[in-house]
């Protein structure tokens, strides 16, 4: 395998975890790029990122930089910043990209300003670069600690997807190639919304049966929207759909689940535990459903609760009194 230069942009938990797991293999030259020179210097010198990944040792093979010119010659560039920061990052770093760089978005969200998928946004900002997406069931802490993790990576060109999967995969981090960028992205965004729904049910003490019902009916909503927007139904049953939903809606490592639990308990919109992508994606997903004439009652209820337009008890009453239909 050819040694490649890989740059991960975004020194948060997920970006750092990806940089760590790729660098550990020592098959490629890997650099973590962030905007804070002081932070990047600390990471380089101390070899630990206590704020994002406490207790995880950063490998000697991993480089750190706050200088955009480190992107020169990079064949693969991972965008690991939050979804709402993608447009700014593309504009900031775009001029420094090598002409043949493949861009991989690693965020699980939808641009809330335009309602566009992140691959669409990046294609507008970086029109001369292939754009891929990495998504699936993987918590940053698990990835960084070398716990077995499998995710999906999708590109329009199957050859590009397979190259990325082969290049980035390692002993504990396995990627499956796909050409369904739409399905992989929507699965990653919608599972966050459904994890909030699962958390609301848990926080309100509505029981495991209600949680199972919301997750399964939410999965049906995910499938309908993915197909309506041009994705593949099979993707819903894969890592970026069902796999990520199971993880995010059941594990208390999930920020979205914890956020939902707080809502269910009436504690308000507490985002002190970190970024909650589903809180931004809910309203956008509901609008996409309306635009494509897709019935998405669970997603709409979550969006209304987050916006303060509906309380939990009323939301559950509305869901339970909807007209009876077939599954």
UniProtKB/Swiss-Prot annotation:
The active site is at 191 (proton acceptor). Its EC number is 1.1.1.94. Pfam families: NAD_Gly3P_dh_C (PF07479), NAD_Gly3P_dh_N (PF01210). Pathway: Membrane lipid metabolism; glycerophospholipid metabolism. The keyword Protein biosynthesis does not apply. It is found in: Cytoplasm. One of its GO terms (biological process) is phospholipid biosynthetic process. Keywords: Cytoplasm, Lipid biosynthesis, Lipid metabolism, NAD, NADP, Nucleotide-binding, Oxidoreductase, Phospholipid biosynthesis, Phospholipid metabolism. It is an enzyme of class 1 (oxidoreductase). SUPFAM superfamilies: 6-phosphogluconate dehydrogenase C-terminal domain-like (SSF48179), NAD(P)-binding Rossmann-fold domains (SSF51735). Transmembrane segments: none annotated. Gene3D superfamilies: N-(1-d-carboxylethyl)-l-norvaline Dehydrogenase, domain 2 (1.10.1040.10), NAD(P)-binding Rossmann-like Domain (3.40.50.720). Coiled coil: none annotated. Sn-glycerol 3-phosphate binds at residues 108, 136, 191, 244, 254-256. HAMAP family: NAD_Glyc3P_dehydrog (MF_00394). Catalyzes the reduction of the glycolytic intermediate dihydroxyacetone phosphate (DHAP) to sn-glycerol 3-phosphate (G3P), the key precursor for phospholipid synthesis. Belongs to the NAD-dependent glycerol-3-phosphate dehydrogenase family. This is Glycerol-3-phosphate dehydrogenase [NAD(P)+]. It comes from Agrobacterium fabrum (strain C58 / ATCC 33970) (Agrobacterium tumefaciens (strain C58)).
């Amino acid at each position: 395998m050819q040694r490649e230069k890989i740059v991960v942009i975004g020194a948060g938990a997920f970006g750092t975890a990806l940089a760590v797991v790729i660098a550990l293999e020592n098959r490629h030259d890997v650099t973590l790029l962030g905007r804070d020179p002081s932070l990047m210097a600390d990471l380089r010198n101390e070899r630990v990122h206590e704020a994002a990944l406490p207790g995880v040792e950063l490998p000697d093979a991993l480089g750190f930089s706050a200088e955009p010119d480190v992107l020169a010659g990079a064949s693969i560039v991972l965008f690991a910043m939050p979804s709402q920061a993608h447009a700014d990052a593309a504009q900031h770093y775009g001029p420094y990209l090598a002409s043949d760089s493949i861009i991989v978005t690693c965020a699980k969200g939808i641009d809330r300003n335009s309602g566009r998928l992140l691959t669409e946004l990046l294609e507008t900002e970086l029109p001369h670069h292939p754009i891929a997406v990495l998504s699936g069931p993987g918590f940053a802490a698990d990835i960084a600690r070398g716990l077995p993790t499998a995710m999906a990576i999708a590109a329009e060109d199957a050859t590009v997807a397979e190259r990325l999967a082969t290049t980035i995969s390692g002993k504990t981090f396995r990627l499956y190639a796909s050409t369904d960028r739409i399905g992989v992205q929507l699965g990653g965004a919608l599972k966050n919304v459904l994890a909030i729904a699962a958390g609301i049910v848990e926080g309100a003490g509505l029981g495991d049966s209600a949680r199972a019902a919301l997750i399964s009916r939410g999965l049906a909503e995910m499938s309908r929207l993915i197909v309506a927007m041009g994705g593949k139904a099979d993707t819903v049953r894969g890592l970026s759909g069902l796999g990520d939903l199971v993880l995010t809606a059941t594990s208390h490592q999930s920020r979205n689940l914890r956020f939902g639990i707080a809502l269910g308990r009436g504690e308000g919109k507490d985002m002190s535990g970190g970024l909650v992508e589903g809180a931004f994606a809910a309203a956008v997903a509901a609008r996409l459903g309306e635009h494509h004439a897709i019935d998405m009652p669970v997603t709409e209820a979550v969006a209304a609760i987050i916006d303060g337009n509906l309380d939990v008890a009323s939301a559950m009453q509305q869901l339970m009194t909807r007209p009876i239909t077939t599954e």
